[in-house]
Amino acid sequence: QSLKEPINTVKVNILGTVLALESCRKHNVKRFIHASTIYVNSADGGFYRSGKKAAEDYVEEYKKIYGVNYTILRFGSLYGPRSDDTNGVKMIVKNAILTGNVNYYGSKKSIRAYIHISDAAKACVDILKNKYKNKNIILTGNKKIKVPIFLKRLSAMLKISKKIEFQNKKYTGHYTVNPFNYKSRKGKKFRLKSSVNFYDGLLQLINEVKKEKL
């Protein structure tokens, strides 16, 4: 969406962040929790990455200039219940259920460390501890999943026999294996004590999508 709406991306990701920071400064908020993305260390991600990267700069500058404490959360590939139709995993699942086709916009070599929303939610509570104050935290799943294997399992779960289609367009804004291919902006990886098995979470999402009014 940000590839098509660069101006709106600036309004939401940059201006929206600055307005929130300014409000925190005026009202002496103890800490600003900022939702960012692992794409800030990537050459991929398009305007979305650019907006998030600029927003992080403002968060850090507000600390330097005004003393507004922060924690930056760099989320990886989220999935799970109550995700909207822009979520990558949900789009794949919903399309498969509606059309009987399993499609992926990206490379066959793609790998993701998917993180279930419940694991991410628990982590968001844990990072309120003082040791995470003024830190950049990376929130991804514990296990790396090869996308072709995930898609094969999805096909089996939905009893789809058609061949999986990879539509590797010239530029989709997404990384293939490693997003960290840009000038490093240091972040500490958050270690999940326990996590939802990806395929258990996938089945949960499939059942939820089937219940929706498609």
Describe these PLM feature segments:
Residues 1-76, 208:
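N-terminal Rossmann-like NAD(P)+-binding domain of SDR-like oxidoreductases, especially those catalyzing
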Residues 18-23, 114, 119-122, 126:
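Conserved mid-core alpha-helix of short-chain dehydrogenase/reductase
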Residues 54, 58-62, 92, 150, ...:
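Hydrophobic alpha-helix immediately C-terminal to the catalytic Tyr-X-X-X-Lys motif of short-chain
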Residues 87, 147, 168-185, 194-196:
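Active-site loop of classical SDR/Rossmann-like NAD(P)-dependent oxidoreductases
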Residues 107, 134-137, 151-152, 159-179:
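C-terminal "lid/loop" region of Rossmann-like NAD(P)-dependent oxidoreductases
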Residues 120, 124, 139, 150, ...:
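Non-catalytic, hydrophobic alpha-helical segments
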Residues 196-214:
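Amphipathic terminal alpha-helices
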